[in-house]
């Protein structure tokens, strides 16, 4: 039986967490929180819009699947404004309901560019976007140049 959109997205987030690295949660293109794996568990950080640390806590007993479900619920609260950017190994970014997919054209490309320039340089290398319509990742490397956004 095919996985639902919700199950697919939770599975993808879960896989990213299991592969180590950092998940940055963005609202209106500002990083508002971060979940990172530190050897024996996960830590959760929250930030203000200037990226100043507000708080941090250890997520004791949390599993990657628990966290993936928490993130999914966080996205669903306000899907038009929430995004997830995966840090090291920095391979994927997820866009929610405001994305559509037609012949490998994504409306979110311009938005992705704006987010990526805030998060770090050269983010177009080895990246992919989660497409809400085809429920799969579209490799960003197929896009010829950021100049297409101008």
Swiss-Prot record:
The keyword Metal-binding applies. Transmembrane segments: none annotated. Induction: Expressed in the early phase of the viral replicative cycle. Keywords: Early protein, Metal-binding, Zinc. Its cofactor is Zn(2+). Coiled coil: none annotated. Binds 1 Zn(2+) ion. One of its GO terms (molecular function) is metal ion binding. The keyword Zinc applies. Belongs to the asfivirus A151R family. May participate in a redox cascade for the formation of disulfide bonds in viral proteins. Monomer. Homodimer. Interacts with protein B119L. Interacts with membrane protein E248R. This is Protein A151R.
